Amino acid sequence: MKPVILFLHDPSTKPNANNNHILLPNAFEELNWETRIYNPEDISLKNNRIEFQSEPLPTKCLIWALGFGRKATTLDRFNILHNAPNFSFVTSVSELLLSHGKASWAEFLPETIISQDVNRIIEEISSGNDQWVLKPLAGSFGRSVHKVNNQDIKLVNSLFRESPDQFWVLQRYIEGIEHGETRTIIAGKEIIGSYLRKPEDAFRANVAQGGQISQTDLSERDRLVVEQIVPRLAEKNIGFAAVDTCEGFLVEVNIVNPGGLSSLQDVYSEDFSKKTALAIIKAKKIS
């Protein structure tokens, strides 16, 4: 009997998102797995059995959440998943919620302030002539990322007015990031590959914002950071992540369906999705 993996994918995901929902199921199918793809919106619970569109899941399967679905009902869906027995997750439900965002990895970041208080952020920016990067705590695709200094107080006030319920990250600008940051894909306990993301506008390297990609090797300083994060991901039961580094600093850890597999394929002319699937299977000890 084939092992089963279930992917949760929201078909309404914006078009600048990645194609993991295509690459990863194909990779598992090549490894003789049965793959199913469901919209997280269609989840229900009957007598402690998860169903999608009235179809019960196998007693045992591997679940890979490639997204949350609608924000308003995310906690309800994750509560159902978290309390259902006999399921194994590529990344645990609790960590998808608790480790999604910059705060979970603050010890590896450059000087960083995280706050919902605009006055606290302005106080830090106004304390000198330093350059900073201001971005949403749980942002993605490089949206709403701004390079700021003490001349940009009006912009900061405007951003906080537009998003009054949002926490923001103020991070000291990393000198050298204009030359690019390195994205490293981690699966299971293995480094799958790394590539350079060079920003189009001097500091936003996200490919969705026009960043350029090329082959690279992890520098010694960046490798030290990545090698400290890999075992922590495993301890937290986070099976798939993208780790962004620059000049020996962590820029970000993305654990919610991070892009990078197709970029690795583009720059190295090699399919990394099967290597990713094998690393997940090995980490989960599934034969």
Predicted segments with their positions:
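Residue-level detector of anion-binding/catalytic polar loops
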Residues: 34, 131, 190, 239
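Conserved N-proximal alpha/beta basic substrate-recognition cap immediately N-terminal to
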Residues: 11-116, 120
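ATP-dependent carboxylate activation and anion-phosphoryl transfer catalytic cores
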Residues: 218-287
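A generic structural signal for well-ordered alpha-helical segments
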Residues: 28, 81-85, 125, 184, ...
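Short glycine-enriched loops at secondary-structure junctions
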Residues: 69, 93-97, 191, 197-200, ...
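Extreme N-terminal starter segment of soluble prokaryotic enzymes
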Residues: 1-6
